[in-house]
């Protein structure tokens, strides 16, 4: 019973996590489309200006219109729908001036990381070297998405992704320092801040004069963010809150001057008068007093970044430093994290690009058995798989960033997928690079072992991949569940809902019979990719059939079916990856890019294997008795390990 209650609680939090409910759909609004006011104004930067005169609660409290049909491909695929608005054609969002401005930034940033920054030295020092730190300030790297009017560079999400990719290619430790500062550290001020908060904090944060940190995780609160214990008690006069508690593993924790802190506060329900504890976000200055930090943590990787525990002891926080609405901190935190995940995928695409270059260089120059090793099939397959993973990750990153720049508000599943896929792909690519390089890859000098150490954390922070898989599956199933509920209601009045019933029921029956639902990507994918397009449609139908069957079987109880949800998420990730590369490769073929035929091969190869994985995975889920036995075995084996305190079986020798 306890496990069931825990699972149900986790499920409710996961469904809140991404904004699938109407409460979160309009939470903070993504950048609104419209003419650019500056050649490099857009995305979060322009949004910060657009909302400067608004009360921070506007996005949380304004009257929400009836929810429109989602344009998210990921939401649609759970329903067996081809929702292509956000994926075809592959989006191109930068105007000529924005493109030119970005090009002018790429060259100096690349040169800086090639000639000035020393990732090995940063790793050895376990800090960002002072020369690099000052150089980053001069480049404006601490305020890439802060509007120029507030001292930043004013980049949109797509421009930001391109520069983050360069950082990820060279030094993930520096990348974490910068990302913890602006991707999550002060992102809440950028998105939720009042005009006064923005004007007070953003200029110094953008220049690097002050550093920001995001304080959510606690010793007893990791993936379960709602269980935080840090408290903020309002004063009787209402002018300030007294903050007490601690936050664990905070990136920039020992460096930061400004903290985005999440704490429990008493909130009175206006309807009932009952007082409940809810999470509230605060902007907290180290200068308020009562803030200390522990020593830098000794870590496996990203050693150049500062990670420390932060303590708050009787910190007086002015009431005007509430970020967003009192009691809306969980939404603020989740929106900040959702908003920044595309940047992680972009950075890791850059990491893979650099690692693949090292692997190719070694394979091209290393001779064994009288042959360059790049001529051997085993090496060829490794290199091909490595570059496919990079291509998919990069395609996802720029797809999501472009969707955000175009004003999409429903991208949470796609952003989560990009984080899951990118972090796992980068690990695989780097591991294979070491394998190709052999003993040399294991040595410190080439720097690949450092990258592998740095990469391990990416599957853990900003939402563990395990939790995000549950989120992807549950969020998608929630939307499909609403549709099934609608069909159930329609059946009570069949004559008044004949069109709906005939359309949806017909598609469902055709899918179940294996006849196909008439969906097609014809006219969207390039003719040379038509076979791969057909594979994607077939995979979508297979996936949607299983989603529907499992929802009908488990109903709301599906939140407890983590074995199933994980496998549905894997299918969703593969399916989204197929569509993204189909879109990107189609654009390259249509525009006659020099690499178009190479991209076609990457796309076709990916789709062939992904379709096979989806087909096999969904077939296994449909073999219900076998799957249930498998799940029971997992539970029993795990229970035995827990009861024994480790491995149950004895050594084969008996002692």
From Swiss-Prot:
Outcome (variant: residue 462 to Q): Loss of acyl-CoA dehydrogenase activity. No effect on FAD cofactor-binding
Entry EC no(s): 1.3.8.9
GO biological-process terms attached to the record: energy derivation by oxidation of organic compounds; epithelial cell differentiation; fatty acid beta-oxidation using acyl-CoA dehydrogenase; negative regulation of fatty acid biosynthetic process; negative regulation of fatty acid oxidation; regulation of cholesterol metabolic process; response to cold; temperature homeostasis
One Gene Ontology CC term in the entry: mitochondrion
Subcellular location: Mitochondrion inner membrane
Pfam family, one: Acyl-CoA_dh_1
Effect annotated for changing residue 294 to E: In ACADVLD; uncertain significance
Biochemical pathway: Lipid metabolism; mitochondrial fatty acid beta-oxidation
Keywords (A to Z) from UniProt: Acetylation, Cardiomyopathy, Disease variant, FAD, Fatty acid metabolism, Flavoprotein, Lipid metabolism, Membrane, Mitochondrion, Mitochondrion inner membrane, Oxidoreductase, Phosphoprotein, S-nitrosylation, Transit peptide
Resulting phenotype, residue 458 to L: In ACADVLD; likely pathogenic; loss of acyl-CoA dehydrogenase activity; Loss of FAD cofactor-binding
PROSITE patterns listed in its UniProt record: ACYL_COA_DH_1 (PS00072), ACYL_COA_DH_2 (PS00073)
Function (record text): Very long-chain specific acyl-CoA dehydrogenase is one of the acyl-CoA dehydrogenases that catalyze the first step of mitochondrial fatty acid beta-oxidation, an aerobic process breaking down fatty acids into acetyl-CoA and allowing the production of energy from fats.
Assembly description: Homodimer. Homodimerizes after import into the mitochondrion.
This protein's name: Very long-chain specific acyl-CoA dehydrogenase, mitochondrial
